[in-house]
């Protein structure tokens, strides 16, 4: 199974009250990224350590209980791709 982890432990996250958007600052590159709710929560799961896609999805299903489970699973898949593309997340070896 592939496990994903954040590329840096020095990422700085900021969630704005009352909104569905958050930002993350990457001090390595100086880049700031805008995150949707699922991407932010995915990162929060990974702050504690690498996880498989299934582990991330289970965590999201607990976090977003009112949402359609199939939609949440698709949103997690999309969030992982966005985070990988942005350089914030990658696969890690066991």
Regions found by a protein language model. Name each.
Residues 28-94:
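Long, charge-rich, low-complexity alpha-helical segments
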Residues 1-30:
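Long, low-complexity, charged/polar intrinsically disordered regions in eukaryotic proteins
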